[in-house]
């Protein structure tokens, strides 16, 4: 089968690999129908994910059809259309039992697919712990509608959930890339008083204004002053940092009011500075870390009910044979791209 593979730092390549086989009774083999490219794939390419293993098939955003299951799998069966969770987790360790599946202690737990084991930018993928890592797609939901459930939408849902948003809050979201928009969709479910999105890319700002006209937008240069003027207590009650740029972490805590919550969703290429003397007295609560993909069944239900719609994010579609072109487009943010669907 064809599989897009991490060769070395800076180099991915479409290569021929054997079709995966069941390796454990809790595995499933999924025929990938649709995959996508995530900014985390670019972090692997650039060498920013030290645990990524050269030689693995990349990709952790995908949907498909179950082809084969191990003897211990009971949640799904061959023929089921499924989303694939970016997190593989055992469901049995301390962290899994407490809902922190990103920190699963099993060797195949956490972010394994497309990082430490073969992922889904390929024709087939083996999914460990299939009962936890696969979710059936409701009959009325298309593959394109479900494509982001296992990763960027799960990230946005997790981030909005832990941010303790209320209907009285002013919420600032920094970054309107794919994860930022998915975070926005999930924040909107909380119905805060106002939502401000900080973004510098004109195409993304235009996308926000077109699809979410009640959301305020502002550039990074004007963000601090704008948030202070358009909030009730001199800053945002909740800030979600989804950009991961060199200056956005500082911007996040600067825009937060005293005693606010700052949720760091972004993955950074470089170390960030936490200048405690500068922020002394703000009494901020920081929440950080990777997505805990416990809510995929819930987000699929919300999609089926029409309460979440991520399909507008799919701006381009490529076949697997042209995945290098898809990466070139996505990495360089050409042609107004938000997300690329890859037909496998």
Can you say where each PLM-predicted feature lies in the sequence?
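C-terminal hydrophobic helical "lid"/dimerization subdomain
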Residues: 1, 200, 225-226, 250-254, ...
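Mid-domain Rossmann-like dinucleotide-binding core that forms the NAD(H)/NADP(H) cofactor-binding site
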Residues: 136-221
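Glycine-rich cofactor phosphate-binding loops and adjacent beta1-alpha1 units
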Residues: 163-165, 188, 205-285
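Short, well-ordered coil/turn residues at beta-beta hairpins
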Residues: 34, 85, 240-242, 344
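NAD(P)H dinucleotide-binding glycine-rich loop of Rossmann-like/cofactor-binding domains
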Residues: 92-174
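Conserved acidic E/D residue at the C-terminus of a beta-strand in Rossmann-like folds
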Residues: 199, 266, 290
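Glycine-rich beta-strand-centered segment in the early N-terminal region that forms part
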Residues: 20-35, 48-97, 138-141
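Short, flexible surface segments
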Residues: 75-78, 167, 258
């Amino acid at each position: 089968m064809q599989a897009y593979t991490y060769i070395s730092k800076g180099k991915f390549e479409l290569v021929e690999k054997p079709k995966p086989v069941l390796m454990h009774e809790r595995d499933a083999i999924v025929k990938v129908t649709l995959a996508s490219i995530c900014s985390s794939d670019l972090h692997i390419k650039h060498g920013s994910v030290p645990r990524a293993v050269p030689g693995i098939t990349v990709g952790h955003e995908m949907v498909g059809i179950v082809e084969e299951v191990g003897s211990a799998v009971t949640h799904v069966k061959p023929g089921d259309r499924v989303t694939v969770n970016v997190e593989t987790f055992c469901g049995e360790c301390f962290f899994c039992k407490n809902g922190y599946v990103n920190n699963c202690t099993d060797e195949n737990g956490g972010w394994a697919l497309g990082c430490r084991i073969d992922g889904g930018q390929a024709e087939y993928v083996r999914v460990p712990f299939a009962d936890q890592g696969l979710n059936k797609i409701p009959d009325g939901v298309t593959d394109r509608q479900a494509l982001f459930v296992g990763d960027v939408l799960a990230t946005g849902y997790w981030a909005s959930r832990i941010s303790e948003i209320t209907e009285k809050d002013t919420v600032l979201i920094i970054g309107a890339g794919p994860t930022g928009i998915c975070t926005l969709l999930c924040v909107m479910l909380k119905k805060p008083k106002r939502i401000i999105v900080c973004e510098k890319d004109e195409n993304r700002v235009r996308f926000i204004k077109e699809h979410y006209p009640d959301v305020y937008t502002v550039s990074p240069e004007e963000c601090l002053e704008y948030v202070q003027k358009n909030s009730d207590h001199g800053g945002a009650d909740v800030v979600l940092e989804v950009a991961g740029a060199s200056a956005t972490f500082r911007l996040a805590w600067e825009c937060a009011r005293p005693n606010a919550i700052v949720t760091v969703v972004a993955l950074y290429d470089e170390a960030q500075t936490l200048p405690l003397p500068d922020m002394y007295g703000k009494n901020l609560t920081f929440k950080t870390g990777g997505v805990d993909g416990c809510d995929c069944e819930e987000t699929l239900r919300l999609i089926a009910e029409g309460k979440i719609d991520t399909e507008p994010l799919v701006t381009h579609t490529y076949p697997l044979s042209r995945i290098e072109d898809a990466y070139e487009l996505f990495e360089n943010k050409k042609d107004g791209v938000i997300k690329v669907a890859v037909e496998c």
